[in-house]
Curated annotation (Swiss-Prot):
Name assigned to this protein: Putative HTH-type transcriptional regulator YffB
One example GO MF annotation: DNA binding
InterPro entries given in the database record: TR_Rrf2-type_CS, Tscrpt_reg_Rrf2, WH-like_DNA-bd_sf, WH_DNA-bd_sf
Pfam families found in the cross-reference section: Rrf2
Domain HTH rrf2-type: start-end pairs: 2-137
Record keywords: DNA-binding
Organism in which the protein naturally occurs: Lactococcus lactis subsp. lactis (strain IL1403)
PROSITE patterns the UniProt entry points to: HTH_RRF2_1, HTH_RRF2_2
GO cellular component: cytosol
Length: 156
């Protein structure tokens, strides 16, 4: 499995916006410049985060984006759903019957499908158990975020 680059970009967008003073917003251009990523791709990502209710969009000359939820209420899985979409990670094509050449057998489900369903369930649980607040706290503990905060202040 591979997460798109949009997932990681989304996490950092959310972490940056969480550091904004209350009632402040930031433009997608400023975020793209800070992360050194494609502005057009980041706009699509941000739209997905807004559509999923993780970000709030404020229109107007001084508009931009801000968090719509607290970091402790946003999990890695919430970001995953916003960026990668809803639905199954693995969808069986039903190839077992073609493989064995008949529809008869002892098992009701394909062993491959069963294993991948269990893997998906574990992944969903794991992603759901990691909040962005945990990530923010760990990042704050391990790194000096002074340069980031100075940059945010300069955006005023």
């Amino acid at each position: 499995m591979k997460l798109s680059s949009g997932w990681e970009q989304s996490v950092y967008v959310l972490l940056i916006l969480a550091r904004l003073p209350e009632n402040r917003t930031m433009s997608s251009i400023a975020l793209a410049n800070r992360l050194k990523v494609s502005p057009s791709y980041l706009k699509k990502i941000i739209k997905s985060l807004v559509d999923e209710g993780l970000l709030r969009s404020t229109p107007g000359k001084n508009g931009g984006f801000s968090l719509n939820k607290e970091l402790h209420d946003i999990s890695f899985y919430d970001v995953f759903l916003a960026i990668e979409g809803r639905g199954r990670i693995f969808q069986s094509q039903g190839l077992l019957q073609n493989f064995i050449g008949s529809e008869s057998g002892k098992a009701k489900r394909c062993a491959i499908t069963s294993a991948l369903d269990e893997i998906e369930n574990t992944l969903v649980r794991t992603l759901s158990n990691v909040s962005l607040a945990q990530v923010a706290d760990e990042t704050q503990y391990n790194y000096n975020l002074g340069y980031l905060d100075e940059w945010i202040d300069e955006m005023d």
